[in-house]
Swiss-Prot record:
It holds the Pfam family UPF0203. Keywords: Disulfide bond. Residues 1-21 are annotated as: Disordered. Disulfide bonds join C19-C58, C29-C48. It comes from Arabidopsis thaliana (Mouse-ear cress). It comes from the Eukaryota. This is Uncharacterized protein At4g33100. Residues 16-66 form the CHCH domain. Residues 1-10 have a biased composition (Basic and acidic residues). A motif (Cx9C motif 1) lies at residues 19-29. A motif (Cx9C motif 2) lies at residues 48-58. Belongs to the TRIAP1/MDM35 family.
């Protein structure tokens, strides 16, 4: 029972986040993709990219001035193709 209370309080805390809806949309998309496609060996196409970008942008805006923005910078360093795609989209 203690776990349920802790889980509920964590859920309540995250729902007050300005990015909570975007986070939920991304997680729902990812979980659906993982369970319906990835597990079956169908991972050719990048899915949930739009949801991830919206969530990442929201985090970036809301974490400005905090050391947590480093997480988003590391994501770019670990995914250089994503940086190239983001650059192409911003220049269009």
């Amino acid at each position: 029972m203690g776990l349920l209370k802790k889980k509920d309080s964590t859920s309540a805390r995250s729902s007050t986040s300005p990015c909570a809806d975007l986070r939920n949309a991304y997680h729902n998309c990812f979980n659906k993709w993982y369970s319906e496609k990835f597990v079956k060996g169908q991972w050719d196409k990048e899915e949930c990219v739009a949801e991830w970008k919206k969530y990442r942008d929201c985090l970036s805006e809301n974490l400005d001035g905090k050391l947590l923005t480093r997480i988003l910078e590391v994501d770019g360093e670990l995914n250089p193709t994503k940086q190239a795609t983001d650059s192409k989209e911003s220049s269009s």
